[in-house]
């Protein structure tokens, strides 16, 4: 009898311990979750504007006293560049764009020249080139907001760490090294480089020869303002059309430093390893450029009907470029697109032209990146033919106004480049330490989640830190095919290869004359997405059939963080808890049998 009583006392104490363990584990996890959310530090967000030339920029000042500067958002090189106000840059043939403020080193009491007299000749991956000197000075971003994990704006903030000061309205960094452009082969203002570091020994662009002071994101990481050298970019506030392209927009985007804001994109955020770039001269390999695996390209009607403009298995590296107003694709792809939208090629202009009215027909191009499809409205690929010197535009012989198609053959660059039209329609995040990029369809400004402020916060809407090797909310989309890709530029011929005669036209006295094609050519009975079977396969851009390849339209990702619960909590009834209780019951029965 005594043994039986002792057994019951042991059994009761065991169950009490079991409940206590479960309760304690659950409370600890919840407390950690709450603490993490409440102590999340704010993220610096730079407001992005657009100037009258279509360039995306952030406002800043340099020097003491501060000299106002516009820095173009440049995701394909890693350095800060300013336009010098002295020396050769005053020459009208130097290529430097003087409508933006220039930097006067001698007017700044905090400026320090690095290696005085040395000229650095730097050539960028897209063909731009600058001659410049290296200078160290203080910089300050003047249009900055502070946002935390609850997506709330912070109005009373002051963070000072090392040489960085971050508060509501500004982000100041002292002793920043940058290139002072003396001359260039393109018109430019300052540049804010955001790419990874470049490997090219013996070349001025090689990053190993410069200190960490030369890298904007590295400076922020070293000061613990951001956790890793990373950023995300949203430019979908740019709602300009070919008619309003040159109208400046003071605030049309966000450059979020060190974090991801899920309220700025829709659908899946696809994550890719950056594709290596091989320098065609030195064969040096760099892995910090935003180069992605571009798959098939579709033209999509306003009802969702689509046609493949490439081939079923098309796969080629493509460079994302925020500074390019045009995109470069394979000649054959551009010809296929031209067939579908009745565009004509004018050799004397080396441009494709199309009736501007197609901008109102709801046509788009679908760019496939693995399982992800990014849709770019065709209206974003049009530019006006208006000439300010003649105060006139081009017209077709039918009387329809003509627009330029902002697509060029990649024979001009040697690489595929997805420019402004693509960038403004995506949300992108870069982890420069892990050499990865994440891309999603950008949420437009008319979407409620972007235009309306809310105090409600859920796990799938909070801003989260990018950590080395981790981009929040992203789904990995690599494959064995994409892992083997490298970008090795081909020969730049500088001209469009043979264009079929029926797609060409002549231009004279403001009028474009040529055969052209009808917008409503419906020569195919079925128009589901598939590779084009003939050179002139076509369909109606106002067709009514649904697009069969609409995966990204319906896909979604909550992005909610996963909390690992205790395996012994009772409200969830997990398998671990059930197994343990069953073991206790079996032990109890065995004990009773022994006592009896």
Curated annotation (Swiss-Prot):
It comes from the Eukaryota. Its main location: cytoplasm. Its EC number is 3.4.23.-. It holds the Pfam family Asp. The chain crosses the membrane at residues 576-596. Present with 149 molecules/cell in log phase SD medium. Belongs to the peptidase A1 family. This is Aspartic proteinase yapsin-7.
């Amino acid at each position: 009898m005594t043994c039986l009583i002792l057994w019951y006392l042991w059994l009761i104490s065991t169950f009490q311990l079991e409940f206590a363990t479960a309760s304690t584990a659950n409370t600890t996890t919840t407390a950690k979750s709450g603490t993490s959310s409440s102590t999340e530090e704010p993220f610096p967000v730079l407001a992005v504007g657009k100037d009258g030339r279509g360039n995306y920029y952030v406002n800043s000042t340099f020097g003491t006293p501060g000299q106002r500067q516009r820095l173009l958002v440049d995701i394909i090189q890693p350095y800060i560049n300013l336009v010098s106000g002295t020396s050769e840059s005053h020459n009208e043939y130097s290529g430097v764009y003087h409508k933006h403020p220039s930097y006067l080193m001698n007017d700044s009491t905090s400026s320090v020249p690095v290696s005085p007299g040395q000229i650095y000749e730097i050539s960028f991956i897209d063909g731009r080139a600058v001659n410049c000197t290296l200078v160290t000075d203080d910089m300050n971003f003047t249009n900055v907001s502070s946002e935390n994990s609850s997506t709330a704006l912070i109005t009373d903030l002051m963070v000072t760490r090392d040489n960085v000061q971050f508060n509501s309205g500004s982000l100041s960094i002292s002793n920043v090294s940058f290139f002072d452009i003396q001359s260039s082969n393109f018109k430019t203002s300052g540049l804010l480089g955001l790419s990874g570091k470049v490997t090219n020994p013996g070349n001025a662009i090689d990053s190993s020869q410069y200190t960490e002071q030369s890298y904007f994101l590295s400076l922020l990481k070293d000061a613990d303002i951001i956790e890793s050298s990373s950023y995300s970019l949203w430019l979908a506030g740019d709602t300009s059309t070919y008619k309003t392209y040159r109208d400046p927009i003071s605030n049309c985007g966000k450059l979020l430093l060190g974090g991801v804001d899920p309220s700025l994109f829709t659908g899946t955020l696809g994550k890719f390893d950056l594709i290596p770039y091989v320098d065609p001269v030195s064969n040096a390999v760099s892995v910090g450029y935003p180069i992605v695996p571009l798959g098939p390209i579709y033209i999509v009607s306003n009802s969702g009907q689509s046609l493949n403009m490439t081939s079923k298995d098309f796969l080629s590296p493509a460079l994302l470029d925020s500074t390019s107003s045009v995109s470069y694709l394979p000649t054959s792809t551009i010809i296929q697109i031209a067939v579908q939208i009745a565009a004509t090629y004018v050799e004397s202009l080396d441009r494709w032209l199309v009736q501007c009215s197609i901008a109102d027909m709801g046509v788009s191009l679908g760019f496939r990146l693995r399982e992800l499809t990014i849709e770019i409205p065709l209206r974003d690929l049009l530019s006006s033919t208006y000439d300010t010197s003649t105060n006139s535009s081009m017209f077709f012989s039918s009387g329809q106004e003509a627009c330029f198609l902002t697509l060029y053959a990649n024979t001009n660059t040697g690489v595929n480049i997805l420019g402004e039209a693509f960038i403004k329609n995506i949300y992108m995040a870069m982890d420069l330490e892990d050499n990865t990029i994440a891309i999603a369809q950008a949420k437009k400004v008319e979407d409620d989640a972007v235009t309306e402020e809310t105090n409600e916060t859920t796990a799938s809407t909070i801003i989260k830190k990018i950590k080395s090797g981790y981009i929040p909310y992203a789904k990995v989309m690599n494959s064995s095919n994409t892992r083997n890709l490298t970008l090795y530029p081909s020969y730049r011929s500088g001209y469009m290869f043979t264009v079929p005669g029926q797609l060409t036209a002549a231009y004279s006295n403001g009028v474009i004359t040529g055969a052209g094609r009808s917008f409503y050519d419906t020569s195919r009975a079925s128009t589901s997405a598939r590779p084009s079977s003939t050179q002139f396969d076509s369909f109606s851009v106002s067709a009514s059939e649904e697009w069969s390849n609409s995966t990204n339209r319906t896909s979604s990702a909550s992005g909610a963080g996963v909390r690992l619960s205790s395996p012994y909590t009772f409200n969830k009834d997990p398998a671990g808890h059930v197994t343990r209780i069953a073991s206790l019951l079996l032990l109890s029965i065995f004990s009773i049998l022994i006592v009896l």
